[in-house]
Amino acid sequence: GKHCGNPYECGFLAYCQSQEPQAEQPIKWLPGRLSNGLQAHIDAHGLTELRDVPDELLNDKQQRVKAVTLSGKPYFDQRAAAQALAAYKLPAYFLDFETIQFAVPIWKGTRPYQQIPFQFSVHRLSRTGKLDQRAFLDVTGNDPSKAFAEALIAACGERGPIFVYNAGFETARIRDLSERFPRMAKSLLALNERVVDLLPVARDHYYHPSQQGSWSIKAVLPALCPDLDYGDLDGVQDGGMAMDAFLEALAPQTSKARKSEIEQQLLTYCALDTYAMVRLWSVFTGSALKI
């Protein structure tokens, strides 16, 4: 009932729901906030299946998700996706961060639960289609922030779009770094001015039934680029696992051999994140470059 999530979500909610009949295509796959009218209709009729929700109570994006889910046929407006990215010329950079946070800060100048970037990957795509990759990873146990900022500025050059997936995350980390290191602030904030978010392009112009209401890169990538699979990675396959691996690498009891193994797993995982963006960009733009 409503009390299960008010004022906070009950810790047993998942368990209780597991005892109930599971919807084949659940309403929770609908993106965005449900309108008051839609929620009232769902509650009044006890609806759980997406197919039973009236179209007239859905916004355009929700209608699209419902239609794709029921038909099993993906939606892709490639022309509109290409148009959205047409202004951004090569060379281009594709950037991803990995971060860690501590309830009790372990590094001077950081605050509780502050997202501290410890790793990045950057792929650079030239006008001729040449693809280069640069990476940063610090598992020494020292505060990685300053070295991270210096390496990031060097890796991203001075011109060309910097593509990310969910720009709010990377740009916020860059702002944090600019505040901590005023001497680098101008160069860091200049990076933010070049950031272009691929997430809205995916959200507005692409949807596959396998996404199940999510536009995370790990939901979109297997649909658009089935040859790439995070599940094939050894050890680190998502951001949460990257955090856990980083903490293990910092632990005093971790052997040198294990630490080296973790480093390689982290580098491989983050590199796939940025290569995935290159591939998404290629599909969205209809690029003829062989990447």
Model-identified regions with their sequence ranges:
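Active-site-proximal structural scaffolding
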Residues: H3, E9, G46, P74, ...
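Generic, well-ordered alpha-helical scaffold segments in large soluble proteins
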Residues: H41-A44, E56, Y88-P91, S121-S126, ...
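Short, flexible loop/turn elements at secondary-structure junctions
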Residues: A14, F97-Q101, R124-S126, T140-G141, ...
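Conserved DEDDh/DEDDy metal-dependent 3′-5′ exonuclease domain
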Residues: Q133-M241
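Helix-hairpin-helix
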Residues: P21-A67
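Residues lining hydrophobic/aromatic ligand-binding pockets adjacent to catalytic sites
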Residues: G72-R79
